[in-house]
Amino acid sequence: MASSKTFFLLFALLFALALLVSTEAAASEESTKTGSVEGVKDAVCHHGCCRWFHHRCVRCCRSAEEVSVSDTENNAAADAHCRHGCCRWFHGRCIRCCPSA
């Protein structure tokens, strides 16, 4: 009776350890994939992205001045959409309007 309990506890401990190791390996692999994708996105445009379509850059800015003009246009569009301006941007789009000025 005692040996079956010991065997069960040993089996449960080994199963939990294997599950923990596989979870850690999957998490580190996922972070590696995410890091490499972000690096690739940053390497696409030297001066930043001036036109986004479906969360992807479709046109790179030719110069740093063009980036500031593009940001100004985005702010104007967001101000027209949001009563108190845009508080949060994501990929060139306003995703959260400010609650008050």
UniProtKB/Swiss-Prot annotation:
Belongs to the GRP family. It comes from the Eukaryota. This is CYC02 protein. GO terms for biological process: cell division; regulation of cell cycle. Residues 42-101 are annotated as: 2 X approximate repeats. Signal peptide: none annotated. May be involved in the control of the cell cycle at the G1/S start transition. Sequence repeats lie at residues 42-64, 79-101. Keywords: Cell cycle, Cell division, Growth arrest, Repeat.
